[in-house]
């Protein structure tokens, strides 16, 4: 359990960074799709 408590925040931080990066890149190439969904 102690290993989970030290690994979970690191994994969450990496996951949110990757997700934010994907959203930023997607918004740069397809800016209209995020603000005007079909």
UniProtKB/Swiss-Prot annotation:
Protein family membership: Belongs to the PsaJ family.
NCBIfam families for this protein: PRK02733.1
Primary location class: membrane
Any single Gene Ontology cellular-component annotation: photosystem I
GO biological-process terms attached to the record: photosynthesis
Protein name, per record: Photosystem I reaction center subunit IX
Membrane topology: Single-pass membrane protein
Species per Swiss-Prot/TrEMBL record: Synechococcus sp. (strain RCC307)
Top-level taxon of origin: Bacteria
Name of the encoding gene: psaJ
Compartments where located: Cellular thylakoid membrane
Keywords: Membrane, Photosynthesis, Photosystem I, Thylakoid, Transmembrane, Transmembrane helix
Transmembrane annotation, as ranges: 4-24
InterPro entries tied to this protein: PSI_PsaJ (IPR002615), PSI_PsaJ_sf (IPR036062)
Main function: May help in the organization of the PsaE and PsaF subunits.
């Amino acid at each position: 359990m102690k290993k989970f408590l030290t690994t979970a925040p690191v994994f969450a931080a990496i996951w949110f960074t990757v997700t934010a990066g994907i959203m930023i890149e997607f918004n740069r190439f397809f800016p209209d799709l995020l603000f005007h969904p079909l």
